[in-house]
Amino acid sequence: MARPKTIHDFGGFPQELFAQQYPVPGAPLAAKEISASLVQPGSKDPVGLDLTDWGLDHGSWSVLKPMFPAADIPVVQLSMDYERAAQDHFAVGQQLAGLRDHGVLIVGSGNLVHNLRAARFGLQPNQAYDWAIEFDKVVGHQIDSGDLAGLQDFQRLGSLAQQAHPSFEHYLPVLYTAGAATPGEPVRSFNTNFQAASISMRSVVWG
């Protein structure tokens, strides 16, 4: 859409967050081209295109606004199908890789550890749980070492994965960015701290 609206798809947070707006331009022509170039893994069905109804939810604007506060960059948001296997999300990321050659920044907005149910506020809120530190460490090592199979097979970590992600929507974005990366290209992590004891703020850059 030409001017995606700012969506506040959350609850229980300070009112100042609900007042936030991020009036970036959309890129409807680019969105059409991207949609036409993608197929759903397995079925090979086309990927749908929404030019009217949704907009930018907090997974997009809450990250992009600090990065580009002038709101002068065109943005296309890609929705995720949570019912699909992790390998399917990675495969879509691989299809997006060619966009990087045209100056497109691919942002996977999530958290390597995200468990709000276990969030701890007050005294020492950033002193993370042992399980949160361990999951973040394992996934961080997989990213650094290029273990893309392990990155996709995160559920093999069993209860550790369940504690880190009671639901998976905050983990899946890293599979898109990892899929879009060129094998062997440089990768680095930064901001490797925690918030509220159960949310990893680790950020990763490929290239």
Where are the predicted features?
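Internal, conserved structured core segments that host functional sites
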Residues: K32-D88
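Short, basic/glycine-rich phosphate-binding loops at helix/coil junctions
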Residues: D9-E16, F68-Q77, Q152
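Generic, ordered loop/turn and secondary-structure boundary motif
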Residues: A2, H8-G11, P25, D57, ...
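Short, structured loop/turn "capping" segments at alpha-beta junctions
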Residues: D45-G48, G103-V107
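Surface-exposed, charge/polar-rich loops and edge strands
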Residues: E33-A36, Q40, I73-P74, Y82-R84, ...
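Intrinsically disordered, low-complexity regions
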Residues: G12-F13, L49, S60, Q94, ...
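A short aromatic-anchored loop/beta-hairpin motif
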Residues: M1-L49
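Flexible, glycine/proline-enriched loop segments at strand-loop-helix junctions
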Residues: L17-P25, S79-A86, A161
